[in-house]
Amino acid sequence: MEARIGRSMEHPSTPAINAPAPVPPPSTRRPRVREVSSRFMSPISSSSSSSSSSSAGDLHQLTSNSPRHHHQHQNQRSTSAQRMRRQLKMQEGDENRPSETARSLDSPFPLQQVDGGKNPKQHIRSKPLKENGHRLDTPTTAMLPPPSRSRLNQQRLLTASAATRLLRSSGISLSSSTDGEEDNNNREIFKSNGPDLLPTIRTQAKAFNTPTASPLSRSLSSDDASMFRDVRASLSLKNGVGLSLPPVAPNSKIQADTKKQKKALGQQADVHSLKLLHNRYLQWRFANANAEVKTQSQKAQAERMFYSLGLKMSELSDSVQRKRIELQHLQRVKAVTEIVESQTPSLEQWAVLEDEFSTSLLETTEALLNASLRLPLDSKIKVETKELAEALVVASKSMEGIVQNIGNLVPKTQEMETLMSELARVSGIEKASVEDCRVALLKTHSSQMEECYLRSQLIQHQKKCHQQECTTSV
């Protein structure tokens, strides 16, 4: 009510606010007319038939006893005037909509319970047309035959959604008391129309409650729900009372179903993400295993290559060592050959002299032997001293020649001895140098092997660093 008063105060230019509401004269109506008018009265939309105008006059008479009710009634009439102007504008633009359908909305007056002193079965007095002649939204009374109940219900269902959209666009909200009456009268609509409306209402409720419904279906379902509230509020006036029922609690089963659906969707999304992560993990494991196999094969190939290279290098080093030994042997042989070649003439002379002295010595020994054999060995020996002396002299002379020759050969032999000693000393020095070369060759071989090992380690370290950089960059 306060919201409606605030809306009416926001529009002070409406002429219906200051106009006094005259008291309608009492009139008698038939029960049939009363039944039809009370059936189609609603606190949401304005009435266009004569029965709705008579019910509005009755409500005006009931609420005009106090100034507060009079002020509220004026505010409601002002809002109804504004709403009627909008409806007239819409009716002018819509050529396919009949006038009776456009004016079949109910009165916007709130339902109030009649005092206990008045008879609830009293006939509703109709308000004459000339009472509200100054209002722009006063409907004209149409002399039409009373429609049937099913026809009016169908007309109500067709026009309620458009009227509800119009009321929502104008900014008019419903009070909490009308919601209870709508729940009560909706049951009567279901009873009157039969099971024809049940499938559509259930499907609309399902479409409205599902979390995956589109905004368009939700808006349509909300319009249909407001339509049923309008129909229930209009049918609540049939009994003459406006008691509001307690609000219906939301369907906990539907909420639980939606929660379960959301939870299932979340679980499905989690399962999908876990599957994606597992697939990515398997891909990475496959990539790592493939890279590890490749690195192992490359490592084995490199080790085989290094081993073969090491064998080749060891063979080369052995061959080099052998060649060096041969070279040193040849060098020493050359040195000895040069020394011997320088002494070859002397040696040849020595051979000639040796032959001569050997022959002379042999002859001397033979001569001495012959001379000794000629000496008599019995008692009757007679020696010629002269011949013996001559033989001894000859022998001594030959011995002296031999001694002289030997004396001549002694310095040569001493020289040869010095040369041989020098040669022995040189050969010892060469042996020591050969041993030093052997040790140096062993050291170079070990250092070469160590160098190859360090190079292989350096290559492996550089390869590992390159692989780590590649993995970090990926």
UniProtKB/Swiss-Prot annotation:
A motif (QWRF motif) lies at residues 283-286. It comes from the Eukaryota. Highly expressed in young siliques, seedlings, flower buds and open flowers. Weak expression in roots, and not detected in older siliques and mature leaves. Expressed in the embryo sac in prefertilization ovules and in seeds following fertilization. Detected in both embryo up to the heart stage and endosperm throughout most of the syncytial phase of endosperm development. Not detected in the cellularized endosperm, when cell division has ceased. Residues 38-55 have a biased composition (Low complexity). Residues 1-149 are annotated as: Disordered. Pfam families: QWRF (PF04484). It is found in: Cytoplasm; Cytoplasm, Cytoskeleton. The modification Phosphoserine is found at residue 66. GO terms for biological process: cell division; endosperm cellularization; endosperm development; microtubule cytoskeleton organization; seed development. Disruption phenotype: Aborted seed development. GO terms for cellular component: cytoplasm; nuclear microtubule; nucleus. GO terms for molecular function: microtubule binding. Microtubule-associated protein required for seed development and for microtubule function in the endosperm. Associates with nuclear microtubules during mitosis. Binds to microtubules of the spindle and spindle-poles and to midzone microtubules out of which the phragmoplast emerges. Not associated with cortical microtubules. Required for endosperm cellularization. May be bound and sequestered by GRF5 in an inactive soluble form during the early stages of mitosis. This is Protein ENDOSPERM DEFECTIVE 1. It comes from Arabidopsis thaliana (Mouse-ear cress). The gene is EDE1.
